[in-house]
Amino acid sequence: VWLRARSGPVRTRLLDALDGVPLPRRALHPATGDETLFGGIDLGATLAAGRTVRAAGMLAQPALLLLSMAERCPPGLAARLGQALDAPGHCLVALDEGATQDESLPAGLAERLALFVDLDAVAWSDTAPLELDAAELAAARARLPAITCPDDALGALTLAAARMSIVSLRAPMQAAAAARAAAALRGAQTVGEEDLRLAAALVLAHRGTPPPEAEDAPAPPDDAPDESLE
C-alpha cells in the first residue's frame, strides 16, 4: 500500500485497522541498512558464546513492513524492498509524508505497491473507526484462491489501463488481484462490476496520465494569399 498522508490521527486510525493483518509488524526508515534487513553477526552473542552467532534480519520471515518517511527512501533501499516484494510473503505500507507531489516514492518501488490511498484532504470528522473482523478476514482469505476473474473483466481492466496511458504491465495484474480480493471480502465467488470499479479506483487512478492537449493549428501568415479571391 502506498499511503500518502501526514502523521496524525487520521493516518493512525487507518494504520490501527492493520492489526487484523496476521503478520508481525516491522518498522523501517530511510536509513535502514542491509544488516537490519538481511541479518548479520550478533557481536554481543558472538563474544558471549565464543563462536560466530548470526542475527536474523527483518526480511527473514514474512512481515508487515511499515516504511516511514517513504518519500525519502534512497534507491538502494527501494531496490531491496522491491526485491523482497517480488517474492510472496511480505506486505509493505509506504508512509509517504511528502509535502508536494515532487516528494514521492522511487518509481520502481511505487510500481510494486498495488494500492494507493491519499488522506491529505481527509479531516478527522470525516472518518470513523475501522473495525476489521478477524474471522471475516480469515474466511475471505480462505475463499480467495477459488475466486474467478472472467476474461472480459481482465480485458476491461487492461483496456482501462491503456486508455489511462499506463504502460506498466503490473498495473492491470495488480488491479485484477485487488478485484478478486474485493470479491472475496463480500463473499462472492466471482469478480463483479463493483469489484472492478473499486480496483480501478485504488490501483489504476493514481497511475493514469492525462492525454496531451491538442495543439491549435498555426495561423496563416499575414501575407498569405486570400483563397476566396482566386
Map each language-model feature to its residues.
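Conserved ASCE/P-loop NTPase catalytic core
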Residues: 1-120
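AAA+ ATPase "lid" subdomain C-terminal helix
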Residues: 162-169, 177-191, 202-209
